[in-house]
Amino acid sequence: MKKRKNKKNSKAAEKALKVTINGKEETVYEQETPETEANKSMTFSNWEEKRQAEQEVAASQEHPDEDEFNWDSEEDKVFKEDPKVVPPFQKKKTKLYAKGKTGAAKPVKRVAATIAFAAVIGTGLGLFALNISGNKEASAPASLEDSLGSQTAKAGDTSADKQTSGAEKQAAQTEGTYKTYAVQAGKFSNEKGAETLTEQLTEKGYSAVSLSKDDGYTYVIAGLASEKEVSQQLGQVLIDSDFEAWGGKELSLSIESDMTDSFKETAELAAKAILDEDITKASVEKIEKSLGETKASETGEKKAILQALKELEDPSAEAGWKAQQELLAVVK
């Protein structure tokens, strides 16, 4: 036999809800879910377990879409335009041309430093070479003009190429000063070195004389010529014989005014003989005749010129150097 369900028990398990539809009132019963009934019948031993269970139930009933955050573009716009909002700091970019300028300056500094270093090294090596060269010091191209000067012989203008006017030459001759070009064979800090070189030159058949000056140096003069180019040619003859020589040095000599022409012409003939140029006997006799007409005594410049002309009566390179040696006696 089937037992009938107890309506009271079934109704008690349902919730009554009155609803009015089209003017008619009806009662609707909502049956509780098993889960609800299970929750109602759940018991807890302490408050901590109850609180934890409630949190788990609340978490399971949360809508999954609530985790997502919807950005409102309008609010974002207001945020950007709000003057109270301070924008984040951004580091300024450095200009590229500044780096390029710095980089371009470095090579210039390196080149300048290299040049300065080379100049210092070169100067040091030059001083070292001068110290080990002994007493002998090679003269610079302008050393003779800058240094030679005394009552007997003195340097002319520092520029060998400078030409004096006719009036200046006439005044110099009136004062007894004769300007010519010399061949410098050496410059020494003591007389002994100059005398040694002078002996070496004369032993080889060349002309030479030492001349001490007030600057503390002693110079070796190896020849005279009235023209600069001729003096340079005489210097080349010595260079070809393994001697050091510099021609074209302007030199002033103290000679009597009435003897300057004869001295000049005799020096020209001696240079021609050394360079193997033709010398006529008539040219030698002409100078001797002009000397005989002068009132100068047979000493000093006149004696030196006459002895030089005697050597040139039989012209040759050897005779030319001997004539030069006689003329160089005037330098002292």
UniProtKB/Swiss-Prot annotation:
Its main location: membrane. Disruption phenotype: Deletion of the gene causes little impairment of spore formation. Mutant sporangia display a transient engulfment defect in which the forespore pushes through the septum and bulges into the mother cell. Ultimately, however, the mutant is able to complete engulfment. A spoIIB spoVG double mutant is blocked at the stage of sporulation septum formation and displays a strong impairment of engulfment. Keywords: Cell membrane, Membrane, Sporulation, Transmembrane, Transmembrane helix. It comes from the Bacteria. It is found in: Cell membrane. Induction: Transcription is under sporulation control. One of its GO terms (cellular component) is plasma membrane. Residues 11-27 have a biased composition (Basic and acidic residues). Residues 175-250 form the SPOR domain. GO terms for molecular function: peptidoglycan binding. It holds the Pfam family SPOR. Signal peptide: none annotated. Residues 1-10 have a biased composition (Basic residues). Gene3D superfamilies: Sporulation related repeat. PROSITE patterns: SPOR (PS51724). GO terms for biological process: sporulation resulting in formation of a cellular spore. Appears to be degraded early in engulfment, in correlation with its loss from polar septa. Residues 1-71, 139-174 are annotated as: Disordered. The keyword Transmembrane applies. Disulfide bonds: none annotated. It is a single-pass membrane protein. The chain crosses the membrane at residues 112-132. InterPro entries: SPOR-like_dom, SPOR-like_sf. Facilitates the rapid and spatially regulated dissolution of septal peptidoglycan. This is Stage II sporulation protein B. It comes from Bacillus subtilis (strain 168). The gene is spoIIB.
